[in-house]
Amino acid sequence: MTSSSPRNEALFDRARQLMPGGVNSPVRAFGSVGGTPRFMVSAKGAYLTDADGAEYVDLVCSWGPALLGHAHPAVLEAVHAAVDRGLSFGASTPDEANLAAIVKERVPAAERVRMVSTGTEATMTAIRLARGFTGRDLVIKFAGCYHGHLDGLLAAAGSGVATLALPGSAGVTAATAAETLVLPYNDLAAVEAAFAAHGSNIAAVITEAAPANMGVVTPGEGFNAGLSRITREHGALLIVDEVLTGFRTGYSGYWGLTGGAADAAEPWSPDLLTFGKVIGGGMPTAALGGRADIMDYLAPLGPVYQAGTLSGNPVAMAAGVATLAHATPEVYSFIDARSLELSAALSSALDAAGVDHSIQRAGNLFSVAFGTSARGVHNYDDAQGQEVFRYAPFFHSMLDSGVYLPPSVFEAWFLSAAHDDAAMNRIFDALPAAARAAASAAVPAGL
């Protein structure tokens, strides 16, 4: 287990007296890996520094936004200049349109863009807009896909092909959950069956462009294109959640690597998309984009209401514009190469330690799934069936060696343009011991 960190421990003790679980987002509590969460006090490039002064190579990258590395000079310069002009105006600002124009240039399917503050807000608005535009009530989501913490999309999967879901969180009413159909991911037959049973009342299908919250799961060949075809045939909308993958997996997000690619074997296009994380460069910003005729259903032009005091905040807009301006094709090529290097080294270390595993990949995002080499991970059941118990000792070995991983096996690993040779070598050096720790993990009773 990780060595003593007294300042972090004291901060966590205090935080637990003031905040539920001592955190403002559950994964930060280290609940699935155990031990004391790290309280970070600074970040620069590829490194984080915690309250005890320990330095870590960062493979979380703020869950994606730190694409260029932490505290990138150009982003800081833009933010400082924006702060000097004022923090919030309650009015429109030039950079709102500047950022929207960048999104539209990179993702032409986003013909209109609405800025919001969080990914949850973006998906919430997308669902409301889809219902308002179609006049229908039901939404299909996939088990294991995460779209923020809005009530209707926290529904858990039921049994059967198109079972109306039960609430997946206390506080979500059965009536709300009943408007969500939860289906197995990568199963077009289940989608077809759901539309056969409920098609006249299905407003939308929402899916992550490539799921990364049950570990990374690659969409099967033709899956996203199939969703586009089925929704179009039935007059429903396809909402593609790129909050995590957008501008992280590539210049035009995961859609740009697949359905929107010039050489796409089966081109497809969403009706609505949601963006977050990278789009704000580390500031709280997200966006909804899509077909002009649908987006124009939003107020003030249309009957679907959405508003936000801090939507399009000038400091956040400045951070987003600066980040995307420096997120060039060369940056993505560099991160892609680093991702391949790291995943290969990870797999090699686990092989050497005799740990069965598979590496799950979507663009430059990847994760490890223990005990899955024979079948891989294609859906939520596969993800849940892995040898989760091996991750905690692996995580803490890496942490002790100065490498900060996602504190859950069900999260993606992130790299940045700041992960230079020194940072990579530190990670490589830590992998063999961590792999041995995973190999020697105690198997829980009953497995």
Swiss-Prot record:
InterPro entries named in the record: 4pyrrol_synth_GluAld_NH2Trfase, Aminotrans_3, PyrdxlP-dep_Trfase, PyrdxlP-dep_Trfase_major, PyrdxlP-dep_Trfase_small
GO cellular component: cytoplasm
GO BP annotations, alphabetical order: protoporphyrinogen IX biosynthetic process
Keywords: Cytoplasm, Isomerase, Porphyrin biosynthesis, Pyridoxal phosphate
Classification via Pfam families: Aminotran_3
Residue positions, PTM N6-(pyridoxal phosphate)lysine: 277
EC assignment: 5.4.3.8
Principal location class: cytoplasm
Subcellular location: Cytoplasm
SUPFAM superfamilies xref list: PLP-dependent transferases
Known cofactor(s): pyridoxal 5'-phosphate
A single GO molecular function term of this UniProt record: transaminase activity
EC class (word): isomerase
Pathway assignment: Porphyrin-containing compound metabolism; protoporphyrin-IX biosynthesis; 5-aminolevulinate from L-glutamyl-tRNA(Glu): step 2/2
Catalytic reaction(s) noted: (S)-4-amino-5-oxopentanoate = 5-aminolevulinate
CDD domains referenced in this protein's UniProt entry, alphabetically: OAT_like (cd00610)
Membership in a protein family: Belongs to the class-III pyridoxal-phosphate-dependent aminotransferase family. HemL subfamily.
Subunit structure, as described in the record: Homodimer.
The protein's name in its UniProt record: Glutamate-1-semialdehyde 2,1-aminomutase
Organism: Arthrobacter sp. (strain FB24)
